[in-house]
Each structure stands twice: as C-alpha cells, then as structure tokens.
Amino acid sequence: MVILGDEKESYTSYCDKNNDILISKQKIEDLKKSIENLLNDKNAHYELNHIKRSLNELDIYTKNKSDLFNNYNLNESLNDSYKDKTFEELKSQLIKQKNLNSCLSLKLKSIHIKLNNLFLKKNEFEKTINNKIKEIELQFLIIQNVTHENKGIPISKELKEQEKHLQNSHENVAIYDTHEIENNDKKKLYTNFHNEEKDHLKCLLEEYSKTLEIYKMGKIQLEFELKCCKEKLNEEIEKNNNYNNKMKSYEIHIDVVKNENCKNLEELNDLKLQLEKTKSENNQNYVKNKILNDEKNNLDKINNDLKIKIKNFKTLLNDAQNKEYILNNFTQKIFNIITYLKNNDEHNFLNDKIHNKLDINQDQIYVQTELYIDIISSSIRNLINFKKTLEERNVELEKVTHEMKELRKELILKKKNYEELRLKLNHLECVERDSVKINSEKEKGEKVIYELKEKLDNDEKIINDLKKKNSYQVYKMKDYEKRENNLINEINKLKLFIEENKMTVERGNEMNNKKLEEMKQKNKELINNLNDISDELKNCIEQVNSVSRNMANVEKEKENIINELQILRMKNDTMRKRISKFVEQEKVLKFKLYTLNNDIFSKNEKLNDMQKKLNDVNEKYKNIVECLNNYKTEHKEQIEKKIERINTLKQNYYYLKKEYDLKNKELEKNIEHGKKLEHELSHCYEENQKLNEEIKRRNSFIKNKDRKIDLLTNIENELLKKKEINNIKLMEKQNVIKNNEQLLKDIKDENEKMNEHVNKLQNELIKRELQNKCISKDIEFCKKEKEDKIKNLEDDLLEKKKCIENLKDELINIKKKMEDKMHMTNEMDLLSNKVEELNRINKTYEKNIVELNNELDVIKKKLNDEEFLKEEEKKKNIDMVYKIKEYEIQIKEKENEIDSLKKNEQNLHVLKNEELNEKEIILKNKYDKEINMIIEQYNKKIQEEKDMLNNKIKSMDQTHKNQIEEMQEENKKELKRLKNVCDMNLQSQILIKENEKHMQEKVEEYKNLLKQKDQELKNIIQEYDERIEIQNKEMEDIVNDCEEKLKQAKINNKKLTTATNMANNNNMLMDENLKEKDKKINDLMKDMEKKKEEINKLVEEKSKLEHSHVKIQNEMSLLVEQNEKLKEEMGLSRIAIKDMEEIKKDMEKYEEEKKKNEEERKKNEEERKKNEEERKKNEEEKKKNEEERKKNEEEKKKLEKDKHQFEEEKERMEIYEHQKEDRKRKDKKKKGHSSDKEEKYNKKEKTKEKSSNILFDEEYIIQLEELRDTGENCFIYLKSLSKELDVIINKLKSKDDALLNDAFNKINLAITSWNIFNEENKEGDNITTVENTATEGNITIDENTTEVEMNNEEVYKIFSVEKYDMLKKEVGEKVECIQKLIG
C-alpha cells in the first residue's frame, strides 16, 4: 500500500492561521522555487502546502493593500495633490501601479495554472492508489473464495470415507446375523470382530476431533485475517476522509474562482460608473451651454440698454448741436454788428476794446459774447448821444449845404471828365502792379508748393511705413487683447472652479471619511457574518461528507452481510450433508436407538423451544428487512431521478458552453476592435505631441522675430528721439496718450467721421472748380478788352500825366486798402501753420505707435505675471470701463471741435476779399487735391485692411464650423462606442445573472441530493429485507425437511426397540454431535443480535440525517436573506464610490478641456484625413461582419450535429441500462430458486459461482474501460491546454496584457468546466456511478472532438501511454517558458 503524507491541514486552515502575514519578494521567489521542485518531484507534499500558504499570504496582502490604498488615497491624495504633485505626475504613478497590479495578477494566474497541474498529478496518484486498493480487495475476495473451497474438500473426503466404512460394517453385521442363526458356534468370532470395529470407530473419532481442531484453528486464522482487513479498511476510510478534506480545499478553490467572478462584476460596475461619468460630463456640458446662453442673453440685454442710452445721448448731442448752432449764429450776428460799428467808427471808439475776431476755438466763448454784448450796449448809448449832437450839427450844415450845392453842381460837371480819365489811368496802373505782384507771388508760391510737395512725399512715405507697422501692431494688439480677454476669462473661471472644487473636495473628504467609517463598521459586520456563514457552510459540508461516509459504510456493511450470508449458506450446505449422513447412520443403527428415545424426546422439546425463539427472531428480522427494502426502493428511485437530472444538466451545459464559446468569439472581436481604436488614439496622441513640438518651435521663431522687431523699434526710437528734440512740449501730451490704451479705436471712429467730412468738401470743391472755370473765361475776355483799350489809351497817356498829381492822394487811400489785403495774407499763414500742426500730430501718432510696441513687450511680461495679479486685473477692467466712458466724452468734444472748425472755415471764406479769391481758389484747389489724394489712399488702405479682416473672420468662422462639425462627429463616434460598451456590459450582466441562477440550481441540486440519499437508504433497507425474507423462506424449508426426517427417524426408532448394547456407543457419538450443533446455533443467535444492533444504529443515523436536513434548509434560507442584505450594502458602497469618482472626473475634465482647446486647432487637417480612413475601415468592417455571419451560421449547423450525436449517445446509455436491469433480474431468479434434492442444489451452486465470476469479470472490464476513458479525456484536455499555452506564449512575446487576461480567463473556465476536482467523489460508488463517469467521459470527449473534429474510434487509435507522457512533458515545458517570460 502507498501511504501519502499527512494531508489533514486543509486550504481553509491555512487561511485562518496566516491572516497577519506580510509578503515580500523573497516569499514570491521561494514560491517559484517550490513550484519548480514540485514539477520535478512527484511526492513533494510539503512544498504543495508551502505553495498554499504563500498563495493565502498573497491574497491577504492584496486585500490589505487594496484597503490601505483606498483609505489612504481617499484621505491623503485629495488633500496633498494640490500642494506638491501635478495631475500628470499622479497619472503616471497610477499607470505604474496599474502595470504592477497587472504583473502581479499574471504571476498569480501562472501560479494557479501550476497548482492546477499539480492537482492533476495528485489526482492521478490518487487514482492509481484507488486502483491498487481495488486490486487488493479483489485479490482478497478471490482468496476468501479459494479458502472456502479448500475447507469444503477435506470435510467431504472424510465424510465419504466414513460412509464407505459404515457401509462395509453394515454388510458385515448382516452376514453375522445370518451366521448367528445358522451357526451359534461362531459367537466368539463375532465378538472379536465387534471389538475390532469399536477400535476402528474410536480411531475415526480421534481423527474427526483432530480435524475439528484444525478447522477451529483455520477459523481463528480467518478471524485474525478479517481483523487485519478491517484495520486496513479503517485506514482506507481515514484516507478517504483526508480525500474529502482535500475536496473541501478544492471547493474553496472554486470559491476563489467565484471571487474572481465577483471581481469581474466589480469591473462591470466600474464600466457602469464610467458611463455615469460620461453622462455627468454631458450634463455638465449642457449646464455650461445653458450658462453661456444665459450670458449671451444678458449681454444682448446690456447691448440693447446701451443702444437705448446711445440713442438718448445722440438726441442730447443733437440738441446741444442745435443750441451751439444758434449760439454761433448769434455770435456771427454780434460780430457783424461789431464789424459794422468798427467800419463806421470814425473816432475809433471801439479799437481799444474790440478785437478783430471772435476766438471760437477758445474755451471762453460764452464770456467773450457777454463782453461783446456789454460793449455793444455802451456803443449804442454813445451812438444815441452822438446822434443828438449830429442832429444839431445837421441843422447848421443844411444851411451850408444849400450854399455848397450850387457850387458843387458846377464842379461836378468838371470833375466828371477828369474822373473818367483818372479811373482809366488808375485801372491801368493797378493792372500792371497786380500783374507784377502776381508773378512774384506765383514764383514764391510755386517754390513753397514744391517744398511742401517734397515734405508731403517724405511724410507720406513715413506715414505709409508707419501705417504698415501700425496695421501689423494693431493686428497684434487685437490678438493680444483677445488672448488677454480669453486668459482673464479662463483665469476667472479657474478661480471659481478651484474655489468650488476646494469646497466640494472638503465636503467630499468629510463625507468620504464618514462613509469610510460607516463602511469599515459594515465591513467588520460583514466579515463577522461571512465568518459565521463560512463556519456554518463548513458544518454543512462536514454533515454532507458524514452522510456520504455513512452511505459508504452502509454499502460496505451490506457487502459484508452478503458475504456472511454466503458463508451461512455454505455452512447450511455442509449441515445438510452431515444430516444426510447421520440419517444413513440411523438406518444402520436403528436397533441401537431404542434405548435413547427418552433422551431424544427431551431434546426434541428443547429444539421446539429453540425453533419458537428462532421464529420470533425471524419475525423481528423480517420487519427490519422490510424497512430496509423500502429504503432501498426509495434510494433507487432517487438515483434514477438524479441520473435523469444529470443528463438534462449535461445537455444544458453542452448547449450553454457552445453559446458561451460564440459569445467569447464575439467578445474577442470587440476587444480587437477596441485595441485598434486604442492604437489609433495613441497614434493621434503621438501626432499631437509632434504638433505641440512644432508649435513650440514656431513660438520660438515668433519670439525671435519679436526680438528683431524690438531691436528695429529701438533703432526707430533712437532716430525719432533726434527729431523730438525740438518737440519737447508735445512729449508731455504723449504721456497722457500712453495711459489711453484704446485711442486707436477712437481714432478709427474719428477717421470715419473725417471721411464723411472730406466727401462733403469734395462736393464743395467740384462746385468751386466750376466757378473757377467761369471766372477764367471772364478773365480771358477781360484780357482781350484790355489789349484793345491799351491801344486806344496810348494816345491818351499824355493827358493822364497831368492828372497824376491829383491822384496821389487817392494812392494813399489805396495803400491803406493794400495793408488790409496783407492782413488777409497773415490769415493764410495761420492756415499753413495749422497744416504744420497736423503733420506734427501725425508724427506724434507715429511715436505713439512706437510706444505701443514697447507696451506690447510690457504686456508680454505681464502675461507671465497674470496668475499672481488676477484680482488687480479685475479692478483694472473696471477702471478701463470708466476710461472708455471718458474717451467717449472726449470723442464727442472732438466732434464738436470739428464742427466749429467747419464753421470757421465757412466764415473765413466769407471774409476774404474778391481780389484774393483767385489766389485762394488756386491754392485751395491744389491743397484739396493733395488732401483728397491722401484721403483716398488712406481710405483704400482702410478698405483693404477691412477686407483682410473680413476674410480672416470668415476663415475663422469656417474653421470654427469645421471644428464644431468634427466635434459632433467625434461625439457621435464616442456615443456609438459607449453604446457598444453598454451592450457588452449588458451581456456580461446577463452572464452574471445566469451564473447566479446556476448557483441557485446547484443549491437545489444539493437539496435534491440529500433527498435522493435518504431514498437510497430506504431502497437499500428494502433490498436487505427482501433478501432476508428469501433466506428465511429457505431456512423454513430446511427446518421442515429436518422435521419430516426426524419424524421418520422416530417411527424407525419405535420399530427398533430390540436394540443391543452397540447402541450405547452410537448414542455417545450422537450426544457429541448435538452439542456441537447447539454451539453453532448459539453462535448464529449472537450474530443475529449483532445485526439487530447494527440495524438500530442505522435507524438512529437516519433520524440524525433527517434533523440535519431540516437544519440545512433553515441555514439555506438564512444565507439567502444575508445575500440580499449584502447586495443592498454593496449598492450603498457603489453610490459612495460614484461620488468620489465624480469629483475626480471634474478635475480630469478641467485639464482635458485645456488640452482640447489647444489641440483642436491642430487636429482639423488631421481629422479630415482620418475621416477618409475611417470610411475605408467601415467598409472593411462591413465585409468582416458578413464573414462573421457566415461563420455563425456554420457554427449553428455544428451545434445541430452535436445535438444529434448527444441524442444517439443517450439512446446507447438507455440500452446499456436496460441490459443491466435484465442482468439483475436474471441474478435474482438464479438466487430465488432452491430445491430439496442435493444434486440439483450442487449444480445450481456451481452455476451461481460461474455467474458471480462472470459478473466479477464484467465489473473488472468496466473499471478498465473507465480508466481508459479517463486517460483519453486527460489526453484530449492536455491537447487543448497545450494549444492555449501556445497562444499565451505568443501573446507574452507580443506583450498584449488584455489578450493575456482573456487567455487566462479561458483556461480557468476550461478547468472549471471540465470538473477536474469533482469527478473523483464517485470512484468508490457502485455500478451506477461507473455509468455516470462513463457518460461524462463520453460527453467530454464529444465536446472536445467538436473542436478537433475527432470520433471515439480515432481517439482509440491515437491514444497511447507514450503519447500521453509526451504531452505531459510538453505542457510542463510550456509552463516553464511562461514562467520565464513573466519574470
């Protein structure tokens, strides 16, 4: 016998002992070494226990680590992440931890695979041990049968020799009687012969006593051997108990697999949480869009309010302008009055008080008007007084005038002639002088105009350069302003977001701490509940195992009873033979038994008493046997139901496995598709990184350009500073303009208004040009007239010379008029000065542009410091709003000034004399033309800039639209992907529900098994009762035969009353034989009492089983209730986890939005290309889907074929069961028949022995076939496992973690589905269990052969022990290769 090491310490005991053990790298290395040693050594049981301990330590370490990690991360990471670490660092750490966890999971899975291989080896050793035990038992049974046969032979030989001797003695007695009648003389010879016969009988008695002693010694030896065998059986029972403990450990391993399924459930819950995260993100985006729409509506309201205010402001401006217009008209009228008074002021009353003109440009217009009104009132008073004096003088003058009139009339007539001549001469002289002056002034004007043109050209060049720079700087300013505004908005949002996040994080931390404390308490309670549940489950499992043990013991006792019954039958046969011999002896010794009738009657009475006792015992025994038979019938019915249930479950399992394989294939395809998408995302991420690098390069290039621009601007500043030496006063005004950052916008508005004014001036200039053309025609006509007049007046010159002297006085007056004309030229000089001032203003604008460039550099620096000055910027924004309002006021003031300038220009045109109109018109035409040219150029540039800006705006709108469309497409794709994920999650949930249903079905199956075992006990008891009834009937027949023979013997004894002394010796022998029979009857009675006690024990055990069954049902109901409570608590924990994950999502969203805003601009062109590629991929995927549909149809056809095969096998099994039942019926018929005759009985015994040998041979053949089937199943399973190991090695080389996890899951599912750990519970059962294993073997072969497409005959051809060993070596090498690849 092979005795394994102590295997009493189960998997659960190590879990209870090693809860406080920490794990290090050394333990993992020790675990690897122990696995390698186990692969090399077959009987290293200590190392197997060490592996179990290390696995428990790993599980405990992972649980403790996960709890600590969750608690620590919830409390620590949220508080410290803002202080020290960035999001990217945390993300990298999380990725590293995930990689470590994945590596540990792979190592654990490899260890589990190795353990499964070790358990397979162990199971093989156990099978070999069990086979050897069966062989030993069979040998032992054969030895028992042989010993019984050997014992029967010498007894029969001795009996035959005794019969021969008795027959010879009977013949001799008959001869002696004849001689006694004939010859009385021969008495002496008879006495001598009789003495010799006595001596011979004594020798026979001594020999018979020796043989009895030898038989007793043999019986003692057999009893000793039986005790030894019982001890061995007890040892084997203990081993079976150890194996049951191992089965418990295997069940715990199954619980570990269930825990893995729970982990998969948790992963599904994580996916659900991710879906909820996406939903929350969409909701947040929806809320943000709502907020933006509300802000838009608010801005629209504000704009409408501003528009209304602007309208009101415009109405006020119009009112003010009207008032100013009235005031200006009033001032003009006053000024006209003053001029009139001044012209008529002969005594110069007003020269000291009134100036030449109102200074409208001054700020004190209203004060001047009041002064002028006061002067006018005083002058009017003086005029009234002067008028009174004049009236008095007029009266005196009228008298003198009458006298003078008469004289004047005479002088008038004379003067008329002279005046005509004077006028002509003066006109000619004036024309000559004017022509000379005009020529000189033209030359001077042309020089001045040439110089001004040159200056204007230079100024235009400078202005164009500055405008180009200005436009570029303005464009930059706009970009920077936009960036500033965007940054300010983002910073404000960030502040609000950070504050909100801080509040939410603090609240979340408080809530999470409370929830963690509650969860810890709940976990403690759950752990206590789970420990109680595990203890109760252990007790239930122990009770079930005890039931199974009791069943095995009952079956063994049943076999022992059958063997003892056979032994009793053999003894009964020997007793019958002996009784027949004694009857013959009675016939021979009838004459000797007459004296012993009294003794025989007394002994017959004793026998009758014994028979009554035996009948009572038999009745009790019959009742017990009937109960046992009832139990046996019920047990048979339960077994049949169980077989039918198992067959249906196998069918369902077969179909579910096929469907599961199909779903696994679909999952693999979806996983591959997901990996492709991940690969594409990684590719996009790499491209984005490249684009970011290019952006950085371009930014550096732009910075270099900005530096060059700064250098150029510094050079320009140095050149301009040289020019600014003479313009120190204007620099003071620049300091005011520096603070006004939005002057450029105001200038544009002013330019638009100036354009309108210029258009008006252009219209006026066109009118003036028409007037100048008319005047030029008049001048030519006058020139012609002058030439004609000159010819006529040459003759009259002589006469004019005389009149020259009289005209000198008039020339003096003309000089005064010329002085007045010179005053008008001074006014022209003032206009030229204004032009120069405008040029200076342009220069100041140029300087402002340079300063703005400097300010841009300052702004760039400020942008880097804006994170620390966010609150100050808010205040600045408020100040900017006030400044904008001030600028608007200044713009309005400037508009008023422009209107005043327009009115002044109109007044200047009125005040000019007719003589200077030609000069002014010419100069104005030239000046206006130049201004128009400048304005047109400026307008063209402005329009070009506007077109450029509009084009840019359109391009930006198009890009934004494209981006929005692309974002929508991406969202659609993400929605599709999420839908697919949801479908996958739903499928996984369906699988989980199916697993739960399967677990409930298993619970129901366990309940049904308990019921079936109860019925099996009843059936066994019924069978036992039936057999005992048959035996009782046989015993009654035997007793009846004995009674009939005794009656015949009594009749014979009455006839033989004349017996001699020879009968005394025979009576002694009979007494000894009767004593021996009494001893045997007492032994049988003791055996019967023992069997009664055993039956009572069985009844008690049955009652205990019923109580345990009730307890198990109650415990199952409690477990169901606790399960529901656990589900509710899991739901609460999931809600808490969701809250934490939503906080993390918000943080992740914020950072993702930042990245997206930067990356969206660059992805536009790339996404267009991707769209085209995706279209192609979609077409390819459609083709693949069509191919997959075809494959699915083919697989469905295969499933139908498999169904037909399964039904055929079921029919075979039914045929086999019918054959078996026929055999049992034949056996019962053979056992039921018995006859009175000895020859027929012996023949039937021989036939029974032959039939028992045939049955034994058949059982032995079935066991060999089972061994071969299990070997073939292992061979096929190892083939499939080697293929999956090849897949794992390839995936490890390619390092695809997701595919590896899928492969490991498949192997675990294959191991659990093949039921390695549950097949060996049924090895010690009867032929029914053999049939179940055979059917399971056939089913597993059929399932595997559907994949490999093999038949049973092909497996028989391929299978051999050498190939099986080769496969084992290959699988071990592949496991070592995987171990090396893992590390």
From Swiss-Prot:
Q: How is it used?
A: Possible candidate for an effective malaria vaccine as determined by epitope response in sera.
Residue runs in coiled coils: 16-49, 117-324
> Could you tell me the keywords of this UniProt record?
Coiled coil, Merozoite
Listed Basic and acidic residues bias regions: 1151-1224, 1233-1249
Q: Where is this region: Disordered?
A: 1151-1249
Q: Which domain of life is it from?
A: Eukaryota
Q: Does the keyword Coiled coil apply?
A: yes
Q: What does this protein do?
A: Involved in cytoplasm to vacuole transport (Cvt), pexophagy, mitophagy and nucleophagy. Works as scaffold proteins that recruit ATG proteins to the pre-autophagosome (PAS), the site of vesicle/autophagosome formation.
Entry's family note: Belongs to the ATG11 family.
Q: Give the protein's recorded name.
A: Putative autophagy-related protein 11
Organism of origin: Plasmodium falciparum (isolate 3D7)
